[in-house]
Amino acid sequence: MTPLDVMWVCLGGGVGSLGRWWIGRIVGEYHHGAFPLGTFLINISGAFVIGYLSVLFGVDWHDRYGTMLNAGVLTGILGGYTTFSSMQLDAVKLSHKGQGGLAVFYLVASVLSGLFAAWLGAMLAHLQG
């Protein structure tokens, strides 16, 4: 890890976090239901993009931190954009509000939809490749 890698991850993380905040606010203005739609959409779209770009960039698990493109985009932007911890917090909040069934549905739907979105992104990149 070099100081330049750290800089790219920090810059990318800031951009991704701002994107998550902006999209979350927009979704929150229009969706007022119990289901945490903003976090769900952010995580699913992020999974799609990381699946797509990982194939497009030819990134394997062991080398995803190595280059400016990988560090800045995959780890930085998409790491800042997606939010596993907010998904967990949303589920805990739903459970504390007596909506345990919705919390379980949210977690299962998030994981399965995220896996499908990442797979779909990877397949699209392979088709274009």
Curated annotation (Swiss-Prot):
Activity control: Na(+) is not transported, but it plays an essential structural role and its presence is essential for fluoride channel function.
Protein family per UniProt: Belongs to the fluoride channel Fluc/FEX (TC 1.A.43) family.
Name of the featured protein: Fluoride-specific ion channel FluC 2
Reaction equations catalysed: fluoride(in) = fluoride(out)
GO cellular-component term (any): plasma membrane
Organism name: Brucella abortus biovar 1 (strain 9-941)
Membrane topology: Multi-pass membrane protein
Any one Pfam family match given in the protein's UniProt record, by short name: CRCB
Residue ranges of the TM segments: 4-24, 39-59, 65-85, 104-124
